[in-house]
């Protein structure tokens, strides 16, 4: 359950599963794409915003009447949702909320159809610019619902907690 507090696997500090997901995403984006911690946190802050802190993997009130709405970490809609569902079927994954399913599809997109966001992130070193680039290039929400300040706030909060978690872990070593 994502609302149940847990001990951080790294530092022993109590965090909820949503932050554990955030920290894992940062680590994976850094490892797979060479992103700085700040840029990765900007990416994750957007996904946090899209899902209400990784609580809602299915869009609650779809904006497009009659549509299935967004699904997954990036609230993929339309053709991208169809591609996510096809990916799940092909990979034999049934849980649309699982980390492996969502990160696997995110990675597939970044390696292929959505690689332009990685190019735009090159040379960016601050969290605000990274958050804006991911929102405007990868997620592309309607202007009415973009709420970039909330995305940046989420990214900054995640970065702060990530750095605190990692510094506590480093002190233990």
Feature roles, as predicted:
Residues 35-36, 94, 165:
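Short coil/loop linkers at secondary-structure junctions
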Residues 123-171:
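Active-site or metal-binding loop neighborhoods of secreted/extracellular toxin and effector enzymes
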Residues 3-27, 32, 51-126:
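Peptidoglycan-targeting cell-wall enzymes and recognition modules
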Residues 1-5, 166-173:
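Generic secondary-structure boundary/helix-capping signal
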Residues 37-54, 132-135:
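Short, functionally critical alpha-helical segments immediately adjacent to catalytic or ligand/cofactor-binding
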Residues 50-51, 110-114, 138, 142, ...:
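A generic secondary-structure signal for well-formed alpha-helical elements
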Residues 40-44, 70-73, 103, 131:
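Extracellular structured ligand-interaction cores
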